[in-house]
Amino acid sequence: MAGTIEVLVPGGKANPGPPLGPELGPTPVDVQDVVNDINDQTAAFDGMEVPVTVEYDDDGSFSIEVGVPPTAALIKDEVGFDTGSGEPQENFVADMSIEQLKKVAEQKSSDLLSYDLKNASKEVAGTCASLGVTIEGEDARTFKQRIDGGDFDDYFDDE
């Protein structure tokens, strides 16, 4: 590959303007082709900032690798709020179901250090705690302890 460009773009809404256009302008690739390809691949992340890596060759060919948005962005999108709590241990901004927790863990699993869905869900629960999001009406830290205690083993065993 002749070069690599890493940018953060709005899911499904990349355009030839900044930050993508100025980076791709001096390269041999067709900017609009890259933009269209990125939009196709990031459509599922509509409304979220998505990390994208574009690798290109001198002949104008390119490949795109789409990353997963930050865990906090996935949680905010899934539960439907804009800003986390300024006092996450006292003021809660939203409540997440265990199904939503599992969905975010599945979306993020390729970027997490966990080997299974149960542990990935615990990592997501940790982010919920820092955002001020409860899980099934409980403080996320308490819910995480219940996962550790095996209360939801049957739920996470259907992997």
From Swiss-Prot:
Matches recorded under InterPro entries: Ribosomal_uL11 (IPR000911), Ribosomal_uL11_C (IPR020783), Ribosomal_uL11_C_sf (IPR036769), Ribosomal_uL11_CS (IPR020785), Ribosomal_uL11_N (IPR020784), Ribosomal_uL11_N_sf (IPR036796)
A GO term from the CC aspect: large ribosomal subunit
One GO process term, biological-process aspect: translation
Superkingdom of origin organism: Archaea
GO terms assigned for molecular function: large ribosomal subunit rRNA binding; structural constituent of ribosome
UniProtKB keywords: Ribonucleoprotein, Ribosomal protein, RNA-binding, rRNA-binding
Residue ranges, annotated region (Disordered): 1-26
Its biological purpose: Forms part of the ribosomal stalk which helps the ribosome interact with GTP-bound translation factors.
Family from the record: Belongs to the universal ribosomal protein uL11 family.
Oligomer status and interactors: Part of the ribosomal stalk of the 50S ribosomal subunit. Interacts with L10 and the large rRNA to form the base of the stalk. L10 forms an elongated spine to which L12 dimers bind in a sequential fashion forming a multimeric L10(L12)X complex.
Protein name: Large ribosomal subunit protein uL11
This protein's encoding gene: rpl11
